[in-house]
Amino acid sequence: MHGAARAPATSVSADCCIPAGLRLGPVPGTFKLGKYLSDRREPGPKKKVRMVRGELVDESGGSPLEWIGLIRAARNSQEQTLEAIADLPGGQIFYRALRDVQPGEELTVWYSNSLAQWFDIPTTATPTHDEKGEERYICWYCWRTFRYPNSLKAHLRFHCVFSGGGGGAFLHHEHAARQGAVPAADGLGLSPKPPAPDFAAPSQAGTLRPHPLGPPPVQACGAREGIKREASSAPSATSPTPGKWGQPKKGKEQLDRALDMSGAARGQGHFLGIVGGSSAGVGSLAFYPGVRSAFKPAGLARAAAAAHGDPYREESSSKQGAGLALGRLLGGGRACGRPGSGENSAAGGAGHHHHHHAHHHHHPKCLLAGDPPPPPPPGLPCSGALRGFPLLSVPPEEASAFKHVERAPPAAAALPGARYAQLPPAPGLPLERCALPPLDPGGLKAYPGGECSHLPAVMPAFTVYNGELLYGSPATTAYYPLKLHFGGLLKYPESISYFSGPAAAALSPAELGSLASIDREIAMHNQQLSEMAAGKGRGRLDSGTLPPAVAAAGGTGGGGSGGSGAGKPKTGHLCLYCGKLYSRKYGLKIHMRTHTGYKPLKCKVCLRPFGDPSNLNKHIRLHAEGNTPYRCEFCGKVLVRRRDLERHVKSRHPGQSLLAKAGDGPGAEPGYPPEPGDPKSDDSDVDVCFTDDQSDPEVGGGGERDL
């Protein structure tokens, strides 16, 4: 459910069959789907909708615009009936039926994958299992547990303090404005931001660089009212009047809306920056990979940026656009001085130049060619030291987030002129593929470096599309993928603060240090689990991303996964303790009891506890009265199965055999009836890792017991 909090919650259910593919919308107002989602479903009034002449209406005949905001967020994919979609990035948001909705079924919605990436909502959720084998979803930042995956995703996006999703240091706009903790942007002459939703109306990239002397920029992106916009009372994004742009307060509102549309408002997403005081442009890079994992510590960049006073990484302060962040980090560092002042004449001139080239408008997520990065607020020291922030949307086993990245030498900044020429490999910065096209002179602009760093003379345009960083010339409208892999090269910072501003004052240095140490312990624990899983050949659910040797081993030795081939992707339920993979959830549930020691079953005769029902069934046979067919002829020990008896004779009575004891000749069978389904008569396909002292390692499952 999104919008204002409602008590009691109203749900929307179908009064008739709703066909798959039906579209509802557009969704009005501020889009905050999942902000009030929780594991519990509070009972409340229900609104029924039905099809009338091909359109869904409620009991009173109201259109979807009147009740679409009452549709609650889905907690998992099983109960989800609708998905939120947008035809274009920044376009209006609609709801689409995923399947045929039966009468009486509640309408629930969640983000589509593309829209989730746009809003920086995690798209994957890996469950863990508690001592009872129930699925739980853990936030690796604050250790809160959830029963449903979407509850965790919503928590990370809107509420988790440590991940930057909400509360505490990273306040939402409305919270920061109420507390008066938002300082005005230094040098811009703007008042503090008024209360505003999380996602504001989109605006052009030109508004990211306000200049007091420049004319009002022209909107070239079209009307986009559906996604990341202000409330319905906000002015139109297609025709901003000069009077609105002329006033400082209105200009601040428009600037905030533009920044909210840009990647800076996507502060909960991945942001990888390698900043250094280099004189070359490629010595420092930054980009948004797109999808982030909800289960690895990924808030370091945001926290580090907040700790160092980075304005565009704090939602509670004046923010800068994602294109600006990319441009500034590509430029090799920060330029000191106030914008538009004598301290940084280059910045002011470039801003003036930009406003006279309003036809070069791009999506706010794109970096315009020739746009200079903005300077930091006065007093912010220029950092010449290298800082690497480990935020990569790659599997944890493949890329470690705790290694150090060495800055590329200035020679790596030389851009080859060939269209598909490869950049020379730089130490510490391996480039898998980088083909730079010949940039049109119209898309280039020379920009003199500041006092602390130097921007390159050639700055291509960058954008993010489908989760991949693209670059190219805006004049040719041709973009090419740029893939950077920093796996195994990033080092975890020694000390880092999760908070800044008023929140930091409430915490002592010891508490801040303990937060970082907790994050390090989590990372080391996850790394150990990953190494164990990879060593067993079962640590990756997708064997296609494994090395050939490990993938081949995983295809033949996966526990409980059946006859999976080495070339087939392995899917199933993974044990986080030992890395075993099970095709059935029940198998993992029983297996987890061997690690946790949870034994809910008991023998009715001797009250011995068991965790595996198959072990209990085999144990009960030991209490059978009368003659048992599986008794050792050498020592009289009673066993449960034929294979247990054979194993017992081989280990306890070496040199003896069942055939010799039978005395019927070498070709005769002993007088033991075959076990049904022998030799594969296991009552369970669960691999048991016994950790208690009551287990007999000889039989591996309690098949041999002394009475």
From Swiss-Prot:
Coiled coil feature spans: none
InterPro entries (alphabetical): PRDM13_PR/SET, SET_dom, SET_dom_sf, Zinc_finger, Znf_C2H2_sf, Znf_C2H2_type
Tissue: In the embryo, expressed in neural stem cells of the hindbrain.
Catalytic EC class: transferase
Spans annotated as Disordered: 184-213, 226-255, 336-372, 545-567, 647-707
Signal peptide: none
ZnF C2H2-type span: 137-159, 573-595, 601-623, 630-653
E.C. no: 2.1.1.-
Compositionally biased spans, kind Low complexity: 232-242
Compositional bias (Basic residues): 351-365
Ranges of residues in domain SET: 1-112
Bias type Gly residues, positions: 554-566
Compartments, record wording: Nucleus
Keywords noted in UniProt: DNA-binding, Hypogonadotropic hypogonadism, Intellectual disability, Metal-binding, Methyltransferase, Nucleus, Repeat, S-adenosyl-L-methionine, Transcription, Transcription regulation, Transferase, Zinc, Zinc-finger
Illness association: Cerebellar dysfunction, impaired intellectual development, and hypogonadotropic hypogonadism: An autosomal recessive disorder characterized by delayed motor development, ataxia with cerebellar hypoplasia, severe progressive scoliosis, moderate to severe intellectual disability, and delayed puberty with congenital hypogonadotropic hypogonadism.
Name of the featured protein: PR domain zinc finger protein 13
